[in-house]
């Protein structure tokens, strides 16, 4: 179920304050956050936000295409190593 429009998008308060503070600067700074549930808003466009995946911070460069998505979508928490190889393939 989607979030109600009247509530607006969720974004952590401290992250929002950092985004507003860095949008006025000339030099771009990487913003670190643990908030994977925060929604990407238009004020974040052209910023680099490092999202924690449980082990390390993954840098995400925000473009207009990413607006409306969650930050956690772009920092995977699991590593897919592939399915087990079948030994029965060559036997007969």
UniProtKB/Swiss-Prot annotation:
This is Small ribosomal subunit protein uS19. GO terms for biological process: ribosomal small subunit assembly; translation. Keywords: Ribonucleoprotein, Ribosomal protein, RNA-binding, rRNA-binding. Pfam families: Ribosomal_S19. It comes from Borrelia turicatae (strain 91E135). NCBIfam families: rpsS_bact (TIGR01050). GO terms for cellular component: cytoplasm; small ribosomal subunit. Protein S19 forms a complex with S13 that binds strongly to the 16S ribosomal RNA. InterPro entries: Ribosomal_uS19 (IPR002222), Ribosomal_uS19_bac-type (IPR005732), Ribosomal_uS19_CS (IPR020934), Ribosomal_uS19_SF (IPR023575). PROSITE patterns: RIBOSOMAL_S19 (PS00323). GO terms for molecular function: rRNA binding; structural constituent of ribosome. Disulfide bonds: none annotated. Belongs to the universal ribosomal protein uS19 family.
């Amino acid at each position: 179920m989607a979030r109600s429009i009247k509530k607006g998008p969720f974004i952590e308060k401290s992250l929002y304050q950092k985004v507003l503070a860095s949008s006025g600067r000339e030099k771009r700074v990487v913003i670190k956050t643990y908030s994977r549930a925060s929604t990407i808003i238009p004020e974040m466009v052209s910023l680099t936000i490092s999202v924690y995946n449980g082990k390390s911070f993954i840098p995400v460069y925000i473009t207009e295409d990413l607006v409306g998505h969650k930050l956690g979508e772009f920092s995977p928490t699991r590593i897919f190593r592939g399915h087990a190889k079948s030994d029965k393939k060559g036997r007969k």
